[in-house]
Design a protein with these regions (language model features):
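Acidic catalytic loop of the alpha/beta-hydrolase fold
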Residues: 73-78, 104
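Short alpha-helix in the alpha/beta-hydrolase fold that links the catalytic acid
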Residues: 65-67, 79-88
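Generic beta-strand/beta-sheet core signal
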Residues: 7, 70-72, 99
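Active-site nucleophile elbow and catalytic-triad environment of alpha/beta-hydrolase enzymes
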Residues: 42-59
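Short beta-strand/loop motif that positions the catalytic acidic residue
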Residues: 63, 69-71, 75
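Short, conserved loop/helix-junction motifs that constitute active-site signature segments
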Residues: 61-63, 90-91
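Hydrolase active-site cap/lid region
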Residues: 1-42, 106
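Histidine-bearing beta->alpha loop at or near hydrolase active sites
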Residues: 93-117
Length: 121
């Protein structure tokens, strides 16, 4: 893989998601787990450590491809602060394009910018 062009990547920094109180939608199962299985959060540390195996931020340094990352700053499903935790750990060539007024939705012309980036291959 030489080029990578994620748009609002998912599964970044689960702990940050919890701190932002965004345990709904895709993360609703987390709230359910704590409510039904661990109401005092006695096993919270272990819970997030296990999720670390699939957390993008923990694998970002292994990505060798050139990355063109795009995100909407109003995204509540994949919050930018959680995405930044992965983006900042990328060690190769990278570029980020931010869309201040957009959330987790179709952003005009993003397909064009991705295709322009991928033409480098």
């Amino acid at each position: 893989v030489k080029l990578c062009a994620p748009i609002y990547p998912f599964l970044c920094d689960f702990r940050r998601e919890a701190q932002l109180d965004l345990m709904k939608d895709a993360y609703e199962g987390f709230s359910y787990y704590f409510k039904k299985c661990d109401p005092t959060h006695a096993h919270e540390q272990e819970f997030f450590e296990r999720l670390g195996y699939i957390d993008l931020q923990n694998h970002a340094s292994a990505i060798r491809a050139q990355v063109f990352w795009q995100t909407g700053l109003m995204d509540t499903l994949c919050p930018p602060s959680a995405q930044f935790s992965a983006y900042n750990k990328l060690t190769g060539r990278k570029e980020m394009k931010l869309y201040p007024e957009y959330g987790h939705e179709q952003i005009p012309y993003t397909n064009d910018t991705v295709f322009s980036f991928l033409r480098k291959l």
